[in-house]
């Protein structure tokens, strides 16, 4: 293992030299003692032809040379436009996760070991030639004994040791960068590698992908917007996934879509509707909707339907995040930058001590040039990206789900404009968001919310005791405490206030039946109502 690690180190070094990534490194404002290390690098004393490639292109080619794990890491980096320079992020978007297929005999052996049966006993036909091959898995076509056409996804064998080794080097590079450069620390490289570690290991578990696909299929059951293939759960294992095979037109095949007279305007608008439906209706969204994972049904070209595959990466938002995101978008397009700043602070996305006036001015400076364009030319994804970049300057904590959401929105938006260049996202999204906000704050929704909070009443005594114990500890009031913990305390106090209000209302109703609310027996109800109201207003 140590020998393999040393060989991998030399491989990384060769790639760094070949693509002159050391030039990029020493262009950073490093400490003098690190900059002096260039004198110890023998290849820097040799004449080298200046590279005609941009820095982004050199980084992309280097990641491609280092193999699939580094390629996928580059793809993850390309979604972090709130952190990376635009030229580098654009180049990394070009990375393709395509690797040669592994031996079909290995695929068959793995399927048989996972299913505990011979391939011929499970499938009436199994194509040994794969349909597609990527860094984590490859896909084979097959037919079940019952006649259904399916695809079989198989995890690439021997992948975990390779991933562990490459992740170790990525962590080492990230930690070194954080120690060496203040600019690097601002990018949180160790945190980014940590996110990637979770993502790549999640993709190795095909049962997780199967569960995601089942959830998405259930969410869009009977919908004309999107179709998700059926999962055959009895044939799914951690390293094997069997799904319905779909036959559709790749969403980038414009010629075929045009030949079958697909309504391109409606198709583009439905893409936007799919995104907002997932985010705001379902709070569960496909977070890898690049063109390779999206097809179009050929059944009704006048009412086109999307088909989504590869549900390995998904995202979700809390009810609070949904609310703040919707309010942010509406405030943005009204150019109400102060409201945007206030929402960020209220949500806890930026620290509570942030000066609203300064934050508002920064948002205005960045966003006003965007809104000088016609609405149909404004990029939703660019708006979110600029917002995140600005908020990072005010110490906004990284919100992984919002990063996934921004990446998904950029994919959907780019796809929609490719299908129909005059797509006006705002005219499609605005009615959806306004309708969602009305429904969210309708009397029916408010009553449902009150009912769900009332379910916490049996736990009120324990919650009160725990909260009082925490508040009695002086160090919890230390202003240096993480903002997230203090935000949690505020939400806990709000919940406690709601519980006291609910309990007081129940006691008041009981007292009203027995006697008068002015009677001595009603004082606990009044006390609980007053305390609950105070906590909610105070917070």
UniProtKB/Swiss-Prot annotation:
Is probably a protein kinase regulator of UbiI activity which is involved in aerobic coenzyme Q (ubiquinone) biosynthesis. This is Probable protein kinase UbiB. PANTHER family: CHAPERONE-ACTIVITY OF BC1 COMPLEX CABC1 -RELATED, PROTEIN ACTIVITY OF BC1 COMPLEX KINASE 7, CHLOROPLASTIC. Disulfide bonds: none annotated. Keywords: ATP-binding, Cell inner membrane, Cell membrane, Kinase, Membrane, Nucleotide-binding, Transferase, Transmembrane, Transmembrane helix, Ubiquinone biosynthesis. It is found in: Cell inner membrane. Its main location: membrane. One of its GO terms (cellular component) is plasma membrane. It comes from the Bacteria. The keyword Iron-sulfur does not apply. Pathway: Cofactor biosynthesis; ubiquinone biosynthesis [regulation]. It is a multi-pass membrane protein. It holds the Pfam family ABC1. Belongs to the ABC1 family. UbiB subfamily. GO terms for molecular function: ATP binding; protein kinase activity. The active site is at 288 (proton acceptor). ATP binds at residues 131-139, 153. GO terms for biological process: regulation of ubiquinone biosynthetic process; ubiquinone biosynthetic process. Its EC number is 2.7.-.-.
């Amino acid at each position: 293992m140590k020998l393999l690690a040393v060989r991998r180190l030399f491989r990384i070094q060769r790639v760094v030299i070949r693509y002159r990534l050391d030039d990029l490194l020493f262009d950073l404002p490093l400490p003098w003692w690190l900059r002096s290390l260039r004198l110890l690098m023998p290849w820097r004393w040799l004449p080298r032809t200046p590279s005609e490639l941009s820095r982004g292109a050199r980084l992309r080619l280097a990641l491609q040379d280092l193999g699939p794990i580094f390629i996928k890491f580059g793809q993850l980096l390309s979604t972090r436009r709130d952190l990376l320079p635009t030229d580098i992020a654009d180049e990394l978007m070009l990375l393709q996760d395509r690797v040669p297929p592994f031996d079909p005999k290995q695929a068959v052996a793995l399927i048989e070991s996972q299913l505990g049966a011979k391939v011929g006993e499970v499938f009436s036909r199994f194509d040994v030639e794969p349909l597609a091959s990527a860094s984590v898995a490859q896909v084979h076509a097959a037919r079940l004994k019952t006649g259904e056409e399916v695809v079989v996804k198989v995890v690439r064998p021997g992948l975990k040791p390779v991933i562990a080794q490459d992740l170790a080097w990525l962590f080492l590079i990230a930690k070194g960068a954080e120690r060496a450069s203040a600019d690097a620390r601002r990018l949180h490289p160790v945190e980014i590698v940590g996110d990637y570690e979770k993502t790549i290991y999640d993709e190795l578990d095909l049962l997780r992908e199967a569960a995601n696909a089942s959830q998405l299929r259930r969410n869009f059951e009977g919908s004309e917007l999107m179709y998700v293939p059926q999962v055959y759960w009895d044939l799914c294992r951690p390293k094997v996934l069997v799904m319905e095979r779909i036959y559709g037109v790749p969403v980038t095949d414009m010629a075929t879509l045009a030949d079958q007279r697909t309504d391109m305007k409606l198709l583009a608008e439905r893409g936007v509707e799919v995104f907002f439906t997932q985010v705001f209706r379902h709070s569960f969204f496909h977070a890898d909707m690049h063109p390779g994972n999206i097809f179009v049904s050929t059944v009704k070209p006048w009412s086109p339907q999307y088909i989504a595959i590869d549900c390995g990466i998904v995202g979700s938002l809390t009810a609070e995040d949904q609310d703040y995101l919707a309010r942010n978008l509406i405030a943005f397009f009204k150019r109400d930058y102060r409201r945007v700043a206030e929402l960020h602070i209220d949500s806890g996305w930026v620290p509570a001590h942030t000066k609203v006036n300064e934050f508002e001015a920064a948002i205005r400076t960045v966003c006003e040039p965007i809104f000088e364009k016609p609405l149909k030319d404004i990029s939703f994804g660019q708006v979110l990206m600029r917002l995140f970049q600005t908020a990072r300057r005010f110490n906004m904590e990284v919100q992984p789900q919002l990063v996934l959401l921004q990446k998904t929105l950029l994919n959907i938006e780019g796809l929609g404009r490719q299908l129909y260049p005059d797509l006006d996202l705002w005219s499609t999204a605005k009615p959806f968001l306004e309708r969602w906000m009305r429904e969210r704050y309708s009397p029916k929704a408010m009553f449902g919310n009150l009912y769900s909070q009332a379910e916490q009443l049996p736990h009120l005594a324990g919650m009160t005791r725990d909260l009082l114990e925490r508040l009695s500890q002086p160090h919890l009031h230390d202003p240096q405490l993480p903002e997230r913990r203090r935000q949690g305390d505020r939400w806990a106090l709000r919940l406690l206030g709601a519980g006291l209000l609910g309990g007081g209302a129940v006691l008041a109703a009981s007292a009203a039946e027995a006697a008068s609310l002015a009677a001595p027996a009603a004082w606990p109800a009044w006390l609980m109502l007053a305390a609950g109201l105070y906590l909610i207003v105070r917070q």
